[in-house]
């Protein structure tokens, strides 16, 4: 049996742009995507800390070290520039893969510059 677990999280990134008339997605600084192990065009969940909105979209590779977090298309109606977001990616894991499981947790400063990478603690008896 496979289960869905968090694979990576970008914690408290700040929205730098919203582009309503774009085909969709979320453009994210390439350094942040690499640090989290999230690929271009990978499905992500976005949780808006400011207003509680939660939605699904996919990533677009942004320029390295730009700090860009641009929410585009219809999702732009759920976010304002300056809103603080949690961006999460999930993956399917087999029981065997869960033995070595640890999500990548990436933290940034208020300019979306990476400050820390850690892994989740294993507090559950499930893995």
Swiss-Prot record:
Keywords: Autocatalytic cleavage, Cytoplasm, Decarboxylase, Lyase, Pantothenate biosynthesis, Pyruvate, Schiff base, Zymogen. Binds 1 pyruvoyl group covalently per subunit. It is an enzyme of class 4 (lyase). It catalyses: L-aspartate + H(+) = beta-alanine + CO2. Its cofactor is pyruvate. The modification Pyruvic acid (Ser) is found at residue 25. NCBIfam families: panD. Belongs to the PanD family. This is Aspartate 1-decarboxylase. It comes from Vesicomyosocius okutanii subsp. Calyptogena okutanii (strain HA). The gene is panD.
């Amino acid at each position: 049996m496979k289960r869905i677990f968090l694979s990576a999280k970008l914690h408290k990134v700040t929205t730098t742009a919203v582009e309503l008339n774009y085909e969709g997605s979320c453009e994210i600084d390439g350094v942040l995507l690499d640090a989290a192990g999230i690929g271009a065009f990978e499905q992500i969940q976005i949780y808006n800390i400011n207003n509680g909105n939660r939605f699904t979209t996919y990533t677009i590779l942004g320029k390295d070290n730009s700090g860009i977090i641009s929410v585009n298309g219809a999702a732009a109606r759920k976010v304002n520039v300056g809103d603080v977001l949690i961006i999460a990616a999930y993956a399917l894991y087999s029981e065997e893969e869960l033995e070595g499981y640890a999500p990548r947790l990436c933290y940034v400063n208020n300019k979306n510059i990476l400050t820390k990478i850690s892994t989740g603690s294993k507090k559950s008896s499930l893995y």
